[in-house]
Amino acid sequence: DRECERALVENADAVSVFGSDVTVAAMAERLGDRPLFELGHGVSVAYCGAGSLERRRLDATLRSLALDICAYDQRGCLSPQLIYVQRSPLLGANEFAERLAQALGSMGATLPRGSLPLALGAEQAQWRGVAEVEGALIRGDGYAVAVRPPEPVRWSPAYRNVTVAPVRGIDEVVSCMEPIGLALKCVGADPGSVEELGQRLGRKPGLRAYACPLGTMQTPALDAPADGRPVWEGLLRPSREV
């Protein structure tokens, strides 16, 4: 409704737009010179360092990942679709995927997946079929875990379809994330990796994602950055003292 849209923004000093890239571009064209804060299409990933694969930490790692994946059925921009797992003699990528599948199955008993939209049924079938050809796929009731190389990235249709990709470590992870660019919103990481990963992200001008602990990806702090900027940027102005 263009009339409602004009009434909403005509007296605004700045406008924040959440939506698809097409929606954001259309609003940018219609708003002219008015300051616009664009929050378009976004994706998120997770990273598990070797320390999180140790026997005493593995269960907590898997529970946290399962929660991040199951919350909102991966439909949000903070939902992890791809999990980078550091290669380790402690646990191979295929075994990690099997353990994650078990965790997703357990989580589904208390947090069941919503109904899969008919429009996504074919997309899910195609994603799973390609995953079986490329590497390995573990299917369950309402979820699937693929194991494949980290590049090129294949995004899932959401709804608890997730990829596990083995990597050498943080250096390779950051290299793999760079092509995702500004669409990358959040990187969940194990406690032993989150600080370093956050620092590395901050040094990459082509990335604006922030790092947070696994298990908290879907519950960001009120002041969590949006596309690398403070959430209040452009929306506040200093008051003049009387």
Task: Give a label for each model feature.
Residues 1-87, 218-242:
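Conserved NAD(P)+-binding/catalytic subdomain of aldehyde/semialdehyde dehydrogenases
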Residues 72-185, 195-206, 211-240:
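NAD(P)-dependent aldehyde/semialdehyde dehydrogenase
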Residues 15-16, 186-188:
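Periplasmic-binding protein-like
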Residues 1-2, 31-34, 141, 171, ...:
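Generic structural signal for short, solvent-exposed loop/turn connectors between secondary structure elements
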Residues 19, 57, 61, 92, ...:
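Soluble or luminal CAZymes and related metallo-dependent hydrolases
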Residues 18, 190, 214:
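Conserved residues at the C-terminal ends of beta-strands
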Residues 19-23, 150-151, 192-194:
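Short, polar loop motifs at secondary-structure junctions
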